């Protein structure tokens, strides 16, 4: 199913900003969370094309209702002398977890929506960033809104 979905996006010239695939509570199904952009008409076309794929069981646009979305990021930052305490304090403010410490760096784990992670990056000096990696977004409807097949 993954190759068919990616092939559809590629063939039609649609852009995938992020893509996350993981098992669900049903061992026979995986859940794909795709983040893409486009006008309402483009999103409608993407949804129609996805629904036509045999491997696709259901398509839900999470932006059509209340939802929770989250991204995971690991960021390695320089941490020497006075920078160390500042990095630790900034990580604490954003509820990050320091998962690795060396004499010259910290690796910080952060989760949250894209805006929160971007705000963290904006709050530290760009020259302090040594390396960054992010997952694609994952999302789920709020409250009683569930994806059931």
Predicted regions and their residues:
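Long, contiguous binding/interaction regions
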Residues: 1-30, 35-149
């Amino acid at each position: 199913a993954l190759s068919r979905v990616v092939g559809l996006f590629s063939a039609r010239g649609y852009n995938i900003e992020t893509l996350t695939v993981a098992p669900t509570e049903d061992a026979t199904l995986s859940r794909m969370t795709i983040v893409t952009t486009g006008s309402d008409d483009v999103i409608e076309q993407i949804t129609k094309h996805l629904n036509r794929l045999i491997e696709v069981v259901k398509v839900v646009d999470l932006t059509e209702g209340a939802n929770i979305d989250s991204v995971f990021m690991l960021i390695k930052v320089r941490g020497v002398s006075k920078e160390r305490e500042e990095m630790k304090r900034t990580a604490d403010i954003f509820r990050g977890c320091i998962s690795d410490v060396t004499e010259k760096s910290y690796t910080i784990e952060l989760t949250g929506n894209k805006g929160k992670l971007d705000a963290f990056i904006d709050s530290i000096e760009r020259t302090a960033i040594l390396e960054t990696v992010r997952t694609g977004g994952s999302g789920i409807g709020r409250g009683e809104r569930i994806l059931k097949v």
